Amino acid sequence: MEGSKASSSTMQVSFVCQRCSQPLKLDTSFKILDRVTIQELTAPLLTTAQAKPGESQEEEANSGEEPFIETRQDGVSRRFIPPARMMSTESANSFTLIGEASDGGTMENLSRRLKVTGDLFDIMSGQTDVDHPLCEECTDTLLDQLDTQLNVTENECQNYKRCLEMLEQMNEGDSEQLQRELKELALEEERLIQELEDVEKNRKVVAENLEKVQAEAERLDQEEAQYQREYSEFKRQQLELDDELKSVENQMRYAQMQLDKLKKTNVFNATFHIWHSGQFGTINNFRLGRLPSAPVEWNEINAAWGQTVLLLHALANKMGLKFQRYRLVPYGNHSYLESLTDKSKELPLYCSGGLRFFWDNKFDHAMVAFLDCVQQFKEEVEKGETRFCLPYRMDVEKGKIEDTGGSGGSYSIKTQFNSEEQWTKALKFMLTNLKWGLAWVSSQFYNK
């Protein structure tokens, strides 16, 4: 209960729900409770219980309390619960309100009504498992729960009744049959228990085997993971090696292509390109000769002679030929021939022009000596190839080259007492003979 002072002459008292603690507004009927109403509310739950003659009176005489009687009706056990003593003035829950009021009698009546109401709630709480008072919602919820319990109890009661009726209808033969069935069921139970024990033993064995298998499976999983890591590492290495192998194969393929290309390449033809430019014979684009209409610089003529000496020297080395009387010394635009009979004698294959050119015959001797070397090369080739023949016949003693297939004239390779046109033509015929010799060497020593 909770109380608050609303005014100097009025005391408000309220009760709260024992479940949700919400304040309650009591019904007006609680204000007009009389003794008869209170006795009806506090009457025992079961009023049909009858005690055995003599026992009830004896208990009432001995104890002075209302009896606790258990009766049976229709196979249902019923118990009589005596009511609680409400009107005891010694109750521990009694109280008296003291407050200011204009009328002392009014306060006394209020205190009495509240005491009666509180005692009534205490009695109701003592007779049930539920504390009172309750609000309307909690009461509805409680009633629903009680209805559910009542339905369950009624169903149990009906089941008990049916079982009792079945037992009453059974005769002695049925009882013996049930006893036999009970023994059989007991034996079946023992057998099943034994099977259960065997199954339990087998389960333990299987559990132990399962643990071993799980441990083995875990070990295998670890090994599999290790093998997988190793496999991944080896796979990575394999991929790297495959890439390297493909790279090497591509390099080898490219090198093989270059090698095949080089094998098909004529080194002499690629190095020494002999051709003509008008009336001039050319080697590597250097003109060999001089005309009044085309005064070629002597530096270009000297360079052409250097390439010519280098070509004949390379052809002789390829054939293993050693020239008699002279040794070729390729030295760029200052190449020369060295006399084998007189080591101190050098025959230059280069000239600077001027007046000295007309009086110095060493240049002419060098060109005649070079023509001698070309003749020796021709004779060496004819030793192994009788059908070999150069297009222009060479006369070393006279220092001339004959145009046997053309006009039939001969042209001197010397510059003294010779025109520039004939000298240039003689040099052109000499380059043509060297081109034929170059072609023969390339065909014979291509794969050597």
Swiss-Prot record:
Q: Where is this cross-link: Glycyl lysine isopeptide (Lys-Gly) (interchain with G-Cter in ubiquitin)?
A: K400, K435
Which residues does the annotated region (Evolutionary conserved domain (ECD)) include?
Answer: 243-448
Coiled-coil segments = 140-267
Write the record's keywords in alphabetical order, separated by commas. Acetylation, Antiviral defense, Apoptosis, Autophagy, Cell cycle, Cell division, Coiled coil, Cytoplasm, Cytoplasmic vesicle, Endoplasmic reticulum, Endosome, Golgi apparatus, Isopeptide bond, Membrane, Mitochondrion, Nucleus, Phosphoprotein, Ubl conjugation
Provide the Gene Ontology terms for cellular component.
autophagosome; cytoplasm; cytoplasmic side of mitochondrial outer membrane; cytoplasmic vesicle; cytosol; dendrite; endoplasmic reticulum; endoplasmic reticulum membrane
What happens on changing L178A? Answer: Disrupts homodimerization, no effect on interaction with ATG14 and UVRAG
Q: Where is this region: Interaction with BCL2 and BCL2L1 isoform Bcl-X(L)?
A: 110-157
Which residue stretches belong to region Required for membrane-association?
423-448
Report any one BP term from Gene Ontology.
early endosome to late endosome transport
Region named Disordered: 47-72
Q: Which domain of life is it from?
A: Eukaryota
Q: What is the effect of changing L259A?
A: Disrupts homodimerization, no effect on interaction with ATG14 and UVRAG
Q: Which residues are recorded with the post-translational modification Phosphothreonine?
A: T117
The cross-references to InterPro entries, in alphabetical order and at most eight, read: Atg6/Beclin, Atg6/Beclin_C_sf, Atg6/beclin_CC, Atg6_BARA, BH3_dom
N-acetylmethionine modifications at: M1
Q: Which GO terms describe its molecular function?
A: GTPase binding; identical protein binding; molecular adaptor activity; phosphatidylinositol 3-kinase binding; protein kinase binding; protein-macromolecule adaptor activity; ubiquitin protein ligase binding
Post-translation: what modifications? Phosphorylation at Thr-117 by DAPK1 reduces its interaction with BCL2 and BCL2L1 and promotes induction of autophagy. In response to autophagic stimuli, phosphorylated at serine residues by AMPK in an ATG14-dependent manner, and this phosphorylation is critical for maximally efficient autophagy.
Topology relative to the membrane: Peripheral membrane protein
Sites where Phosphoserine occurs are at S14, S29, S88, S91, S94
Which family is it part of? Belongs to the beclin family.
Q: What else is known?
A: Expanded poly-Gln tracts inhibit ATXN3-BECN1 interaction, decrease BECN1 levels and impair starvation-induced autophagy.
Role noted for this protein: Plays a central role in autophagy. Acts as a core subunit of the PI3K complex that mediates formation of phosphatidylinositol 3-phosphate; different complex forms are believed to play a role in multiple membrane trafficking pathways: PI3KC3-C1 is involved in initiation of autophagosomes and PI3KC3-C2 in maturation of autophagosomes and endocytosis. Involved in regulation of degradative endocytic trafficking and required for the abscission step in cytokinesis, probably in the context of PI3KC3-C2. Essential for the formation of PI3KC3-C2 but not PI3KC3-C1 PI3K complex forms. Beclin-1-C 35 kDa localized to mitochondria can promote apoptosis; it induces the mitochondrial translocation of BAX and the release of proapoptotic factors.
Q: Describe its assembly.
A: A homodimeric form is proposed to exist; this metastable form readily transits to ATG14- or UVRAG-containing complexes with BECN1:UVRAG being more stable than BECN1:ATG14. Component of the PI3K (PI3KC3/PI3K-III/class III phosphatidylinositol 3-kinase) complex the core of which is composed of the catalytic subunit PIK3C3, the regulatory subunit PIK3R4 and BECN1 associating with additional regulatory/auxiliary subunits to form alternative complex forms.
Comment text on domains: The C-terminal evolutionary conserved domain (ECD) contains poly-Gln-binding domains such as the ATXN3 poly-Gln motif, consistent with structural docking models revealing two highly scored poly-Gln-binding pockets in the ECD. As some binding is observed with BECN1 lacking the ECD, other domains of BECN1 may also interact with ATXN3. The coiled coil domain can form antiparallel homodimers and mediates dimerization with the coiled coil domains of ATG14 or UVRAG involved in the formation of PI3K complexes.
This chain belongs to the protein called Beclin-1
Q: Which organism is it from?
A: Rattus norvegicus
